[in-house]
């Protein structure tokens, strides 16, 4: 089973899995929805293959009295499944090959700001799942039985204590909601708000920058190797420093992901005894 990583800094993760048919004749309970999401996560952990896709990122910083900073980056994004040394678990690793920065060839392959988000595909932001019930409070929004095609909406908020925080995927007090497609029981949209988020960690004698983070993720079904997985199609983030700060600053990030493909390893034999190319 893939290792699930804690939700740290700007990380965000994927909710994927096999389509599971909703029960049309019976309104699901909160417990049943959590069970379905746990099954989706387990399917993702064990079945999602290594993939690559087109990534388009717009990163901005807006500060009062200063010109805006804008960076547009186009890359080939890769999500690679790496087995552990003992072959018992796997970890999903993010890689990217930057193709252009602001329309020009890149001078380096390290993505830079002004605003960054990492870890979006790396593991286990299971905010709506059975294994996070000790860390979260869940509320199922009232379901309109006359509109069976409307998404189920689950609201959540963290319940962090000194005893449970170490095992919680959300390490900062946060709240949000997810929208779940009733036909497939897959999450199609995630909203997360963290009122006091560490935007920039402390460095030496410089205090950290604390502020509000608002994060949204949209998911879409993608066929990979004959199986359907719900992958991020759009990720947006809006950070603002605390209102008491002298210079109000906003950090914005928007990434779109298109043209997903399963990674394939091919080998061909070259004439003359040359080594095969992989």
Region roles according to the model:
Residues 1-4:
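N-terminal secretory signal peptides that target proteins for export/translocation
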Residues 23-175, 182-189, 193-278:
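Structured extracytoplasmic
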Residues 6-18:
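Bacterial N-terminal signal peptides
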């Amino acid at each position: 089973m893939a290792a699930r990583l804690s939700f740290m800094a700007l990380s965000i993760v994927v909710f994927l899995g096999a389509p599971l048919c909703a029960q049309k004749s019976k309104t699901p309970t909160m417990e049943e929805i959590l069970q379905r999401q746990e099954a989706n996560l387990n399917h993702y952990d064990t079945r999602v293959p290594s993939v690559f896709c087109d990534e388009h990122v717009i990163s901005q910083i807006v500060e009062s009295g200063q010109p805006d900073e804008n960076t547009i980056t186009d890359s080939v994004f890769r999500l690679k499944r790496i087995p552990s040394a003992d072959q018992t678990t796997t970890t999903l690793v993010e890689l990217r090959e930057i193709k252009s920065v602001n329309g020009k060839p890149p001078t380096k392959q390290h993505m830079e700001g002004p605003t960054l988000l990492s870890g979006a595909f790396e593991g286990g932001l299971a905010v709506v799942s059975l294994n996070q019930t000790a860390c979260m409070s869940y509320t199922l929004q009232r379901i309109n039985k006359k509109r069976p095609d409307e998404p189920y909406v689950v609201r959540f908020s963290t319940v962090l204590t000194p005893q449970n925080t170490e095992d919680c995927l959300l390490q900062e007090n946060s709240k949000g909601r997810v929208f779940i497609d009733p036909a497939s029981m897959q999450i199609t949209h995630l909203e997360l708000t963290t009122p006091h988020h560490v935007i920039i960690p402390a460095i030496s004698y410089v205090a950290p920058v604390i502020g509000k983070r608002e994060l949204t993720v949209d998911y879409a079904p993608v066929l990979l190797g004959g199986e359907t997985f719900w992958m991020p199609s759009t990720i947006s983030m809006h950070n603002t420093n605390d209102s008491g700060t002298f210079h109000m600053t906003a950090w914005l990030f928007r990434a779109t992901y298109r043209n997903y493909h399963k990674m394939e390893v091919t080998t061909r034999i070259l004439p003359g005894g040359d080594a095969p190319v992989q």
